Amino acid sequence: MSMSKLLSPPPTSPPGPALSRLPCRRVAPPPVLPFPFPLRRLTSRRVFATSCSSSDSEHAPSASSTALAGAGDDLSAGVTQEREGALPFVQLSSGIVLRTEEQSLLGDHAPAPAPASAASSFALLDELNGGCREDDHLGETPAYPAAMNALYAACLAGNATEQLWNFTWPAAVAVLHPASILPVAVLGFFTKLVVFAAGPLVGELISSLPRIPAYRSLAAIQTAAHLVSVATITYAFAVHRAAAASLLLRPWFAVLVASTAVDRLACVALGIIAERDFVVQLAGAGRPVALAKANATLSRVDLLCETVGASIFALLLSKNNPLTCIKLSCVISLCALPLLIFLCGEMNRLADGIFDHSENTTSHAEKTSSFSIRKTVEEAVATVRNGWSEYMRQPVLPASLAYVFVCFNVALAPGALMTTFLIHQGVRPSVIGAFGGSSGAVGILATFATARLVKELGILKAGAAGLIAQSALLGAAVVVYLTGAVSRRAGALFAFLGLIVASRAGHMAYSAIGLQVVQTGNPASKAKLIGATEIAVASLAELAMMAVAVVASDASHFGALAALSATAVTAAAGMYCRWLANPSDELRRIFPS
């Protein structure tokens, strides 16, 4: 088919004398033409609407007019001759509608546009392709890319010290009483209790404070809590060791509980600021692809820190006793604090100072002007009640509750209880470090695979796939443990640990996907309050499991904790899949795909 035939009037237009062509002249159309779209007055030089989510192959022009015409139904182009004072438009089925400006807008002395040639048509299509790719690039780029890199560096510095600390303190406490997991379980119980009770308050408090000073202060508080914990554990090693039950009644243990709770609370607050505020603001409004990439990068940073922390812990423990390891961990925290403070300020500078003020400075000033203890307590209770109310009303509540159920898994995951269990089993430090490091490495790989999983299945179904995979692998790990071969054969122990490591892929996939589901389903004004309440509910789940661990204080009861952990993850997968099987209208609106 020739280009002249392609540019001929539509077959629905009746032929007649009025349509006869004259050289270099415009022709007038018949009085009525069946336009597929109403003609509207244009105010811009070139207005086009395009679906930039389509692949480049859908928008790329053909190399010849024959290829362009051969597109058939996939390229239904209707070119109509213009009315007096209106230029033609080209309708493409790929979603591109190009309209040129009215001749009256060209000026009195502007020459009339010449009829479109094949070369000019291709040039227009090339320009549209370039605009689509430019829009894609803008949607994938954060609003403040340099500041986002500074945020990644700050999270790297903070998470590295935190992950190393999370390995060293359980090992040191476990050595205080090698025959029982009770001290570690009690510390975990009270830590989760404090986070559960104060989580919504923390979310409200950090919303009323300038973000940069609050972030720096929390980092300093966390480091101070590490110092107090190290001093307390050092004192505990110096005094005469007692039975596990009487050890809990010592004054130094109460101080250790308080410092550990403060450390965890500061960690939660830092995470809320970084994941629910900083990353959202730096990604920019209306840039979901940039936000998704930023969330994935933060997950990789956290997992990289987990891998590095476990490796450093294994190296330190192989050459030193647990007390020396925890002292070195505290020194690393002290060294990282100045770097963290600097990177936080640098991030704000690169973001043009968007974090200089709190989000609600007026209400905060009103609160501080009329301070009273009774009013403060009433406001705290109201904040907690409001946080729970907003959390229960969120449209993506099942996705958040599935994450809470996953948090019941405190036994079959790298953490305090698993580290204590492995030490009691007499496992070598290199194996403990390899377990933690490989768990982080698998998580990092999962963040890359998650993007493809979301592309193939969609974000909601990809979350279900992650939960199902995690529940299946943890169930297999429990079966291996309950056979009783873990304590007798090294092969069974490695199989048990290997299944847990593999389950981290599903865990991290749902962690990344669930975070974006909750971010997308809730307005920005309520993000930190709902996020803090979600963490409080998750701490309640961990609190319940730690209470079970306190009751089953003997290491021989670890199998019961493992079975409960696997059951909770299975329940999370079932609840999430049921939610997807019966979607509400609100869910279809938020996630139309």
From Swiss-Prot:
Keywords from the named record: Chloroplast, Ion transport, Membrane, Plastid, Transit peptide, Transmembrane, Transmembrane helix, Transport
Domain of life: Eukaryota
SUPFAM superfamilies for this protein: MFS general substrate transporter (SSF103473)
Boundaries of the annotated transit peptide in chain numbering: 1-51
Disulfide bond residue pairs: none
Database matches in Pfam families: FPN1
GO biological process: iron ion transport
Coiled coil: none
GO molecular function, one term: iron ion transmembrane transporter activity
Transmembrane regions listed in the UniProt entry: 181-201, 219-239, 253-273, 303-322, 323-343, 403-423, 431-451, 462-482, 493-513, 530-550, 557-577
Region span, Disordered: 1-23
Topology class, membrane: Multi-pass membrane protein
Cellular compartment(s): Membrane; Plastid, Chloroplast envelope
Chief localisation class: membrane
Biased composition (Pro residues): 8-17
GO cellular component entries: chloroplast envelope; membrane
Main function: May be involved in iron transport and iron homeostasis.
UniProt family annotation: Belongs to the ferroportin (FP) (TC 2.A.100) family. SLC40A subfamily.
Protein name: Solute carrier family 40 member 3, chloroplastic
Organism of provenance: Oryza sativa subsp. japonica (Rice)
Biological classification of the source: Eukaryota, Viridiplantae, Streptophyta, Embryophyta, Tracheophyta
